[in-house]
């Protein structure tokens, strides 16, 4: 189902989706067919083999993510847990204080909005779900959560399996 606020243009193997939050473009393989009828987008196959069925599901989901992204945007929230862990946004970069001897500067790619709430919560918004996930993973890779003290950068709602420390010799 295509939202009314979204324009779709399918030419050859190229899909262009325009909406309130931006424009996304993706090239699809020739085995995938796309038809527009009555506000619906139908993704089909030219021949059905096991590998082609997998690609069919993949591209159906990718196109659906494009439709949702340009009409609503995707949001990932990261939480910084640890003493002295802070974040701030400067034009075109995210500055993190993560216990290193220097602040960590991460360049914000085009099409991604970053907002810091209360110094320890980072909201990342984008219409491209793939770019959003890659950027969030890049930020998280600077301090992944560790199981002993529970410090690090976590996705909102993520639970860290805690481990007991070493039991000393007695």
Model-derived regions, located:
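N-terminal intrinsically disordered, cationic/polar leader segments
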Residues: 1-68, 72-137, 141, 146-170
């Amino acid at each position: 189902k295509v939202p009314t606020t979204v324009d779709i243009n399918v030419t050859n193997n190229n899909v262009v989706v325009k909406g309130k939050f931006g424009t996304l473009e993706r090239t699809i393989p020739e085995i995938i067919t796309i038809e527009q009828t009555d506000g619906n987008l139908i993704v089909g196959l030219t021949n059905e083999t096991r590998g082609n069925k997998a690609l069919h599901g993949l591209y159906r989901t990718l196109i659906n993510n494009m439709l949702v992204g340009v009409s609503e945007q995707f949001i990932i929230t990261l939480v910084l847990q640890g003493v002295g862990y802070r974040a701030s946004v400067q034009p075109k970069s995210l500055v993190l204080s993560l216990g290193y001897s220097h602040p960590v500067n991460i360049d914000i790619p085009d099409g991604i909005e970053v907002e810091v709430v209360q110094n320890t919560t980072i909201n990342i918004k984008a219409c491209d779900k793939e770019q959003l996930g890659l950027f969030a993973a890049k930020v998280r890779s600077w301090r992944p959560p560790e199981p002993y003290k529970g410090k690090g950068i976590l996705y909102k709602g993520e639970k860290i399996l805690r481990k007991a420390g070493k039991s000393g010799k007695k």
